[in-house]
Regions:
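Juxtamembrane/disordered regions of integral membrane proteins
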Residues: 1-116, 120, 124-136
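Beta-strand elements within well-structured catalytic alpha/beta cores of enzymes
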Residues: 157-177, 191, 217, 372-378, ...
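Short, structured active-site-proximal loop/turn typified by the sulfatase FGly-forming signature C/S-X-P-X-R
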Residues: 178-215, 220-224
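Active-site-proximal N-terminal segment of extracellular/periplasmic enzymes that hydrolyze or transfer
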Residues: 141-196, 437-438
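Active-site neighborhoods of enzymes that stabilize oxyanions during catalysis
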Residues: 235, 242-255, 264, 270-275, ...
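Catalytic or ion-translocation cores adjacent to nucleophile or general acid/base/metal-coordination motifs
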Residues: 190-200, 403-405, 420, 427-478
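A long, amphipathic alpha-helix that forms part
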Residues: 352-353, 357, 365, 373, ...
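His/Asp/Glu-rich, glycine-adjacent segments
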Residues: 137-139, 220-388, 482-485, 511-521, ...
């Protein structure tokens, strides 16, 4: 038991800043206990404080009891539930109240007063402690580390290093390099300056979005994912990558059963699981009880512990207020992005709840000695969609994630296994005002005009990523099933642009992924060629090609294969013939390969559109409701990065997620 408390004290010292931090923590604990005792005596008539010295001694006794008893309860009963440990703490405090009254430090009239007083004392203690620690992540995660040390006290130490992959969703390499130069990422900067870590670039191919990148990175197969959403002619419905049902189907198509995380890994906060045996907050496994872990110490602690619950509630409210203030300021100085409700709630969910919960789950998995671990932090990507990739709100998100990286590395040093880290992005983002704002109408309205009023056009251009990100959080928090799942699924499908399966398919479906859009004709079997489209909808393709907001249009031509139109010329992707001005000149060098790859997919739309791209400003015109976007071509959305141990070399920047997957396989196999 002496060794047990010595470990707790050592970890407390490490996470509070040494001896001085321990002293400050001790003083704060006593002061909070005194305040909680005063409030308890004030609100409960059956509890009376005799005098100031006696009250101080009573507060000291209660604080000491909580400090010494809580770790023991965590060690021995939290495997049942953190709620059991909390209940036992309250009962032990009630006994302490009664015993203290026997030595006349305080007066307690009846045993039930002691029980109610103990409960109120715990609530006040939790509220004040949570309020004081809202800005102190070290205190919060240090508490978790001490709890895990208590729970896993008999675990053997493993000397072989594990691997943790930290994905910063949507962060482009040029943006990261700007943060490093400005000193806003001190932890990553320190790793790179030490020479132990190296920053490299990699190029995601079309579509530049998470489901395709994660399919390639985690499963080594990104075929059949032409965008964030698309019309699936085989099933006659809209596929949306982050809807759990569709994510599960995507994983079924790309998985061989031997993904990057197979056999011993953990997936946290991802769209796809990489075949990990342990998954949390992962869209593809939310409905799979064999994969999605519903019970863990972290999930119990995060959603049941009063201290944790109150803390993240306060932080979430603060984040909503912060967003409302920043959105109002942005509206006065710039063209505002789409920041109306429910976005402030989505920002709180990603920037507070998902960030902290994912971090806690990573730390718990490290204490389980899991490897490899792959976690996706989505808060920067979500914020950048609405404020822009390099606005102050997005910069704050990157700085916050750098702090989280430091906390994860610090927690790894206390755990039973050493870990190596890889930090990467799945794609970047490109800035630019929405297509609808630039040209007065959304893409589906333009297509409606060109096709005719009698044509039924279904648009899927609303921003829905935050709905998909909130869904796993709600599922983990409440175990949504049955009617509740149906009720929460319905608005998601509506906002995604999905239709009721019982309804007749529309004539034209417009499915947007950033500044990429797939135009599909559900009534035309197979891939529709240009002559068939022109016959059914005269002037549609030509009208799109001539529109100033459209950078290129790819459509198959009978006898020639895919041809790219736009910018005063055409580019035959099969033969390489160019007539007039090459429409791909303004885009990145990998554009032709990316479009050929897209066309080869059976799931590709009949017509593929990419918006205009201004090479001077780096701006695109997203078809979705975003001012920072990805999914298509143009700008920094195609500039991803990877920070890795220097000895894990890369000969040349990988092109495509599958290529990077193969490189990572060579690193991870011996490491895990």
């Amino acid at each position: 038991m002496i060794g047990f408390y010595a470990t707790q004290l050592r970890l407390l010292s490490r996470w509070t800043g040494g001896r001085a931090g321990v002293v400050r923590r001790g003083v704060a604990t006593i002061v909070i206990a005194m305040l909680a005792l005063v409030v308890t005596a004030w609100l409960i008539p059956g509890i009376t404080l005799r005098d100031v010295p006696s009250a101080i001694v009573a507060a000291l006794a209660l604080a000491a009891m909580r400090t010494l008893l809580r770790p023991v309860l965590i060690a021995y009963v939290s495997h049942i539930s953190i709620a059991v440990a909390t209940i036992l703490t309250v009962l032990a405090q009630a006994l302490a109240f009664w015993l203290i009254s026997r030595v006349e430090w305080i007066a307690v009239d009846r045993p039930e007063d002691a029980l109610v007083g103990s409960l109120l004392f715990s609530i006040v203690n939790a509220i004040v402690t949570a309020m004081l620690s809202t800005g102190d992540d070290n205190s919060f995660f240090g508490t978790l580390v001490r709890q895990l040390a208590a729970r896993h006290r008999k675990r053997d130490v493993t000397r072989e290093p594990g691997v943790v992959f930290i994905q910063i969703d949507g962060l482009a390499q040029p943006i990261l390099e700007g943060h490093l130069r400005a000193g806003r990422c001190p932890n990553l900067g320190r790793w790179l300056r030490s020479g132990g870590m190296t920053l490299n670039s990699w190029k995601p191919l079309l579509p530049t979005q998470t489901s395709a990148s994660q399919a390639g990175l985690l499963h080594g197969n990104d075929d059949g994912i032409p965008g964030f959403r698309w019309w699936d002619k085989k099933t006659q419905r809209l596929m949306v990558s982050n809807h759990p049902k569709d994510a599960r189907e995507i994983q079924r198509r790309v998985s061989s059963g031997d993904g990057l995380l197979a056999k011993s890994g953990a997936s946290i906060g991802n769209l796809l699981s990489g075949d990990a045996p342990r998954s949390f907050l992962t869209a593809a496994t939310l409905d799979d009880p064999a994969r999605e872990i519903r019970r863990s110490h972290v999930l119990d602690w995060f959603f049941i512990s009063p201290y944790s619950y109150i803390r993240w509630t306060l932080l979430s409210v603060g984040e909503v207020i912060k967003e409302l203030v920043q959105a109002r300021a942005a509206a006065r100085t710039t063209s505002p992005g789409p920041r109306a409700f429910p976005y402030p709630l989505a920002r709180a969910a990603t920037n507070v709840l998902l960030r902290h919960l994912s971090t806690a789950l990573v730390i718990e998995e490290m204490w389980r000695r899991t490897s490899p671990i792959y976690v996706d932090f989505v808060d920067y990507d979500e914020i950048a969609h609405h404020s822009g990739p390099d606005r102050v709100e997005a910069r704050d998100a990157v700085a916050g994630l750098d702090k989280i990286i430091g906390i994860i590395a610090k927690a790894a040093a206390d755990g039973p296994r050493p870990y190596r880290f890889v930090v990467l992005s799945d794609h970047g983002q490109s800035p630019g005002a929405m297509f609808a704002d630039r040209y007065g109408k959304p893409l589906e309205a333009l297509i409606q005009e060109l096709a005719g009023k009698q044509v039924r056009v279904q648009g899927a251009t609303a921003h829905v990523e935050h709905w998909g990100r909130i869904s796993p959080l709600l599922s983990e928090a409440s175990g949504i099933n049955g009617m509740t799942r149906t009720l929460t699924s319905a608005p998601f499908r509506h906002h995604a642009g999905a239709r009721d399966d019982a309804k007749e398919p529309p004539d034209i479906v417009v499915a947007a992924s950033g500044n990429l859009a797939h135009i599909s004709f559900p009534g035309m079997s197979g891939r529709a060629a240009m002559d068939s489209i022109d016959a059914a909808y005269p002037g549609l393709v030509d009208g799109l090609v001539r529109h100033p907001g459209i950078g290129l249009v790819m459509v198959r031509v009978n006898g020639r294969g895919p041809v790219v139109h736009g910018g005063g010329g055409t580019h035959d992707l099969t033969e390489g013939d160019i007539k007039g001005v090459d429409p791909l000149t303004r885009f990145e060098p990998t554009a032709a390969d990316g479009l050929r790859r897209l066309d080869a997919m059976a799931e590709c739309g009949d017509v593929v559109i990419v918006s205009m791209f201004d090479a001077a400003s780096g701006e695109v015109a997203p078809f979705e409701e975003q001012i920072g976007s990805h999914g298509g071509l143009g700008g920094t959305q195609g500039d991803a990065f990877i920070v890795h141990p220097t000895e894990w070399g890369i000969d040349a920047p990988p092109v495509g997620a599958v290529t990077l997957h193969k490189q990572i396989r060579r690193w991870v196999r011996p490491a895990s």
